[in-house]
């Protein structure tokens, strides 16, 4: 006898690299930072900054979400990451007195409505006809709210680690999420791009 397929009530989506395109958004933020410093950024300049960002993210341990010491300092290190990006840009391209303006432009632009991953909006719209959709993401609350603004109407809840007081994949994140939803784990399906950081 064929086993009956599990019926989910909630589909819980990670945000970056699942629903929204962080890489495209970060490149846009680099261009805005250079513009705020009075520079016309070449593609090579943007790519160099993007490569540094990825390297610095790893060096700060922000990929190591299973380590207790990282979990305790994740949001602090996120701010450090942004400062080190701007320091790199200043070192390489001499932002000078416009360094502060560049940093503000970078952060403000990264908090703008994000580029959706190809096909995401259409897929989410279709799924919202049958399921309740939620977001579960690590990041800064104000930034993620801005980035998700054009898709927000599709989600019943948006859970951001800074507001939750704990990051994924800590069990406490999911326990608090389930409590807020007043549901159980067997009624939810988590959808993301990383087995190590999303579940």
Where are these regions (language model features)?
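N-terminal helical cap/lid subdomain that shapes the substrate entry/recognition surface
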Residues: 5-118
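Core-facing hydrophobic residues within beta-strands of well-ordered domains
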Residues: 8, 154-155, 185
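Short hydrophobic segments within beta-strands
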Residues: 14-15, 136, 191
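Receiver (REC) domain switch/active-site residues of two-component response regulators
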Residues: 16, 156-157
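Catalytic P-loop NTPase motifs of RecA-like helicase/translocase cores
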Residues: 19-21, 143, 197-198
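Substrate-recognition element of Asp-dependent hydrolases with the DxDx(T/V) motif
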Residues: 98-115, 120-150, 158-161
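Conserved Lys-Pro-Asp/Glu-containing loop-to-beta segment of HAD-superfamily phosphomonoesterases
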Residues: 167-199
């Amino acid at each position: 006898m064929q086993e009956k397929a599990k019926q989910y009530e909630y589909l819980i989506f990670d945000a970056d690299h699942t629903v929204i395109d962080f890489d495209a958004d970060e490149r846009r933020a680099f261009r805005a930072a250079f513009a705020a410093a009075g520079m016309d950024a070449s593609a090579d300049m943007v790519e160099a900054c993007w490569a540094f960002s990825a390297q610095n993210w790893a060096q700060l341990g922000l990929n190591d979400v299973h380590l207790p010491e990282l979990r305790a300092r994740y949001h602090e290190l996120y701010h450090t990451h942004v400062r080190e990006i701007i320091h790199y840009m200043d070192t390489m391209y001499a932002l000078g007195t416009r360094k502060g303006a560049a940093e503000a432009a970078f952060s403000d632009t990264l908090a703008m409505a994000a580029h959706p991953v190809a096909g995401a909006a259409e897929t989410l719209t279709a799924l919202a006809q049958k399921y309740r959709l939620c977001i579960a993401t690590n990041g800064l609350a104000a930034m993620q709210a801005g980035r998700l603004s054009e898709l927000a109407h599709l989600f019943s809840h948006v859970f951001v680690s800074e507001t939750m007081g704990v990051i994924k994949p800590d069990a406490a994140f999911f326990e608090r999420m389930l409590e807020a939803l007043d549901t159980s784990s067997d009624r939810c399906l988590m959808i993301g791009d990383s087995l190590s950081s999303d579940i």
